[in-house]
């Protein structure tokens, strides 16, 4: 029961307060550790970089998972304290309010007619170069990022919390942070390869689960769920990432729009124009989808805690 309550406490804290200060934010600590390891990485030599990168991909997540396990063990005899602290420690592994607020930053700038400001705000959502994006492209990039990050920033960490507790959520967040910092082409091609592959593996189920949650939330909000499913099945595998395209394609279908990253992919069909109000609707669908998942996960954790899980799966 403590795990279910801690999950709900963490979600409530996120929606009410947002992100904790950087000094006490575990993801900031992860970033600092990764930055130090990047500086210590061997210079040159693919084999050396691959080996060092593989060690990074295991050492950093395992270290933070071990910290989570240690905290959980210390708190086990104290249920009330465990509830409060577990919720506070779980919160930094996901970021729903920050995701929504970043998207609203793009929307607000567009509503003010400030395309340059919207391009700057988009940098908080994704790593794409926004310098040449016009308003429709900024809307598309925002909608894509909100949909994709519904998985990375919310569903995935809570999925691993439900399976493995606080250590699971911290392990996932460390892997995802590694992928963000070194798991891309270019300078860190070989250093980040293991992190990128591990991130792909960990996100395989959550990304597809997120797409289904978006369809359910979209249906509840009166969006075109039938088209959402069709576009998910048709276009979900068109992105370079094996996972990112699933929630993005579902969202494209729900909103009846085409989401394009020029030179890379096109998801959905241009039935409706890319207007700035779609950022609001995408955020509403994502918030509803993630809250549905949080409620479902909490209910399952509570059921298992009360011993109902054994009866259900006997």
Swiss-Prot record:
Cellular component annotations (GO), alphabetically ordered: plasma membrane
Membrane-spanning segments: 55-75, 152-172, 200-220, 285-305
Subcellular location(s) of the protein: Cell membrane
Main location: membrane
Keyword entries, A-Z: Cell membrane, Cobalamin biosynthesis, Membrane, Transmembrane, Transmembrane helix
Membrane topology reported for the UniProt record: Multi-pass membrane protein
Recorded metabolic or biological pathway in which this protein acts: Cofactor biosynthesis; adenosylcobalamin biosynthesis
Pfam family, one: CobD_Cbib
GO biological process entries: cobalamin biosynthetic process
One MF term in the entry's GO annotations: ABC-type vitamin B12 transporter activity
Keyword rRNA processing (UniProt): no
Keyword Zinc-finger part of the UniProt annotation: no
Annotated function: Converts cobyric acid to cobinamide by the addition of aminopropanol on the F carboxylic group.
PANTHER family (alphabetical): COBALAMIN BIOSYNTHESIS PROTEIN CBIB
Similarity field: Belongs to the CobD/CbiB family.
Name used for this protein in its record: Cobalamin biosynthesis protein CobD
Organism: Sorangium cellulosum (strain So ce56)
């Amino acid at each position: 029961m403590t795990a279910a309550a801690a999950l709900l406490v963490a979600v409530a804290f996120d929606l009410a307060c947002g992100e904790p200060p950087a000094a006490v934010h575990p993801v900031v600590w992860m970033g600092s550790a990764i930055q130090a390891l990047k500086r210590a990485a061997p210079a040159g030599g693919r084999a050396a970089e691959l080996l060092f990168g593989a060690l990074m991909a295991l050492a950093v997540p395992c270290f933070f998972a071990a910290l989570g396990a240690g905290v959980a063990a210390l708190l086990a005899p104290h249920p009330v304290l465990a509830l409060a602290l577990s919720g506070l420690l779980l919160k930094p592994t996901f970021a729903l309010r920050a995701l929504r607020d970043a998207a609203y930053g793009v929307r607000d700038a567009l509503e003010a007619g400030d395309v340059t400001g919207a391009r700057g705000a988009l940098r908080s959502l994704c790593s794409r170069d926004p310098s040449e994006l016009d308003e429709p492209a900024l809307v598309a990039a925002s909608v894509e990022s909100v949909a994709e990050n519904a998985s990375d920033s919310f569903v995935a960490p809570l999925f691993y919390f439900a399976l493995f507790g606080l250590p699971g959520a911290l392990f996932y967040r460390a892997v995802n942070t590694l992928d963000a910092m070194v798991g891309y082409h270019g300078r860190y091609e070989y250093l980040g390869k293991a992190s990128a592959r591990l991130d792909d593996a960990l996100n395989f189920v959550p990304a597809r689960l997120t797409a289904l949650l978006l369809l359910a939330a979209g249906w509840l909000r009166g969006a075109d769920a039938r088209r959402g499913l069709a576009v998910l099945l048709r276009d979900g595998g068109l992105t370079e990432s094996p996972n990112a395209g699933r929630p993005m394609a579902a969202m494209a279908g729900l909103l009846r729009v085409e989401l394009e990253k020029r030179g890379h992919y096109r998801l959905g069909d241009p039935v409706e124009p890319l207007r700035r109000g779609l950022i609001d609707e995408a955020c509403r669908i994502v918030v509803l989808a993630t809250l549905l998942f949080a409620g479902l996960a909490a209910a399952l954790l509570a059921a298992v805690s009360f011993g109902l899980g054994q009866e259900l799966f006997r």
